[in-house]
Amino acid sequence: MRERIKATLCLAIIALFGCSTENHLVSGSVSNHSVRNEVALDQPWRFQFSADLPADIYAPGFDASQWQQVSVPHSWNRVGYYLDSASPHIHTQQNINVEQGVGIYRTAFSLDAANQGKHHWLEFDAVSRVAEVWLNGQYLGEHRGSFNRFRLNATDAVTYNAPNILVVRVDNSKPTAESNTADTLPIAGDFFVHGGIYRPVRLISTNDVHIDMQDFGGAGVYATTVSANDKAARIDVNSRVTSHSLSESAVEVEVNLLNASGELTATTSQVITVSNSNTAELNQVLDVQQPRLWQGTDDPYLYQLEVVIKEPNGTVLDKVRQDFGIRTIAITAEDGVLLNGKPLHLQGVAYHQDREGRGWAVSEQDVEDDVAIMAQMGANTIRLAHYPHGQPVHNIANRLGLLLWDEIPLVSAWRYGEQHEEVNKAIADNASLQLIEMVKQNFNHPSVAVWGIANEVDFGAVVPMFVQSAPGSNPDPVPLLKRLASEVELLDASRPSTLANCCANVATWQRANVPDTSAITQTTGANRYFGWYYGNANDLGPHLDDLHKQYPGQPYAVTEYGAGGAPTFHTDNVLGGPVAATGRNQPEEYMTYVHEVNWQAISQRPYLWASWIWNAFDFATTTRREGDSQDINTKGLVTYDRAIKKDAYFFYQANWTDTPMVHITSRRYKDRAYQVADIKVFSNAPLVELNLNGKSVGQRSECTHRTCIWESIRLAEGENSVTAVGLDIDGKELVSDSIIWQLNTSQHNAYFIDAGAQIAATTQNNYFGSDNFFTGGQAASYDKPGGWGRPPVLADIHGTEDRDLFATYRKGEFGYRLPLDNGSYRVAIYYVVNNNEAPVDFNVVANDELVLANLGADDAANDGLNAHVREATVIVKEGLMAIDFVALTGEPNVSAIAITPF
């Protein structure tokens, strides 16, 4: 098996950079325009999850009736599901499928005798991970890689006027150093690699002479805008023409540029001689007068580039036609992105291709819908993470003027341990192969701005065990990165190379252990999660300044930032307690907070050439148990099923678009814990007015980052109607948004505060809110984080049936300020005595009067953690209860506060 891997990779790599002769990893689909015959092989297929090929599977009479009937695109996986019951979900615990192994596909198609004399190609847009293909029992070849298109020459295997039996063996086994998929990237990554024939399959028939079908899935035609302005443009067109004719022949290769109306704008032609089994390569130049440039979202004008092969008598032998935008692109540290010489700041999102119910087997309409969601938010760029995406997203981006970051699946790990050097070399070759395929298949798309060669491989270097190296060793990805960067320049000198790193100058990692990847490629991206995995959200700006100071001549972007958010989890104060970056406590409001703070830092740093949010949509990954989901990364601005746009989505829509919009945040937090709330509204309107229960509570204008806040708004008992109205400068209504919040009687003129908690515990008797209304102190928990995919380690707290309520606490020097009606109140203080640590003694002062003394000091307790409650009566005279905790010995610690009138 290892020899086959090595041979296959060698064939592909060396064909381009100097390795060998024949290559079966071939071309991409193009428009046929009545010259090529193209048949979609979408259904019916039969599928069985099995590693064994039945001996008679190639026979027309083989009985596959017990196999699953499927249509292609297809994936056998269903991964990730939500735990809430607020809405119906396609995925449930009962119907998911995370199997990684081998599946067999079988179908039949027919060709009539009129197709004899043609050459026939089976084109697969993507099969994950390793595909082996047989037609009528004849082995056609294999492809190693989950994402790029490949073609196999089926000419000698087809039959006419009889069924053609097509069998595909798909190996999606999890890569290990010993597996059949060992060399096939990705070998790591925080996303699930779905198995199957998950993009379309078709049969293409050509004449003897045709544009090259064996060029790594590319179109065989590669056009580059050499220069362009509004007066003139020059386009270099490289075409590859293949002949299977038994004799030499002269053909004319004509290149045409058609405008959007189909009118000829520029043309050139050349006569060449082609011979049997030879591929001729020629370069031609188109000069275009008064071109209409492809100017991003401002004017995404598309021509059509057409290459026609003709016989001397004018008979058309082959024709390909693709959308083409005339544009140049450059990226510098001084000016950022220059599109046709004009500065363009890129702001957008990263995008994984899966969605609930389909996995990776999405339709073109699914992709169209996804891109529409991103574009409506105001994104002008998409990072296609962490692998090559299909043609639909590229075509849509061309039409809409979106700029794309394309990248290969070299993610986190690039090798196994030192004892596996043979397969490690094969992995490097597979990286080169997937890079060649990606560049050639997407070369003509004006939307593609950069070619990405890696994502966070510096992580594998700072954590050697991640790449199976011994602790203390220093595995180095830099040689491979330099190789790939140089290959990009050979493949396409018109676009910059790029990569995304994770760890440079992040305090979590010792700088000496982090490989310097920042200046290997022509541009660089930083994946940074301040306020989530490390540090505070406000740390991002100074960190970026540090990078810019260290690499002043390197164009730097932010390629990932953000936080997880569960739309069914809510907090009253994002700073009320610690967030669980790898666990369940991920309130929607904290996610929004991180985006607000991070975007403020990014938008104030013009030296950044681009930024991409992580991520547009929640996506599947079996490494996570977080938020309100299982096996889902919750950082998406939109849920996995596309049903909910989280609040952070509307923050960007307010800041990135001018089409009038208004959005009230925390709308899904309907049953309110507190009678007093800050109401936050995102809007791009000049004026925003807030109404509560039909009465105006004021207008806001020129809100910072288009975020308007009305502080300390008191809700009425029962139903509360909240409406935000966006107004023009003359006070005329442009747009409005309304929600309903509920304040139950038990919460009216009362407080139940779960101190130290960002998400309140569910208790036996009362409805507690998360920690809020505090001044000072520090949030803490007696529970310990469980880490990636593991539940927290719960502390054993004696003396209570509400363990979760006592598990979190606020400690140090702190107090609470609580608006209340005048009157008498019962105040209950919940706290824990830890007899295994130094004693703690503190007093409780309310409105400057001592109401409880010596909490902790007089409490008899068992060993370990013991729950206690002390009560006092407090009279409110001026509409406010001020509670302070005064240390006598050690630090005060309070787990909860309950305040009720009597």
Regions found by a protein language model. Give the residues of each.
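Extended substrate-binding grooves/exosites of carbohydrate-active enzymes
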Residues: 79-88, 175-185, 190, 200, ...
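Accessory beta-strand-rich segments of carbohydrate-active enzymes
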Residues: 49-50, 83, 95, 100-214, ...
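An acidic-aromatic loop/edge-strand motif
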Residues: 78, 158-232, 243, 293, ...
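Surface beta-strand/loop "capping" patches
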Residues: 208-244, 653-685, 749
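Beta-strand-rich binding/interaction modules
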Residues: 135, 231-272, 280, 677-699, ...
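Extended carbohydrate-recognition surfaces in non-catalytic/accessory domains of CAZymes
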Residues: 28-123, 180-190, 194-197, 209, ...
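Extended acidic/polar, glycine-enriched regions
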Residues: 159-163, 238-332, 710, 716-718, ...
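Compositionally biased, intrinsically disordered or flexible polar/acidic segments
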Residues: 742-902
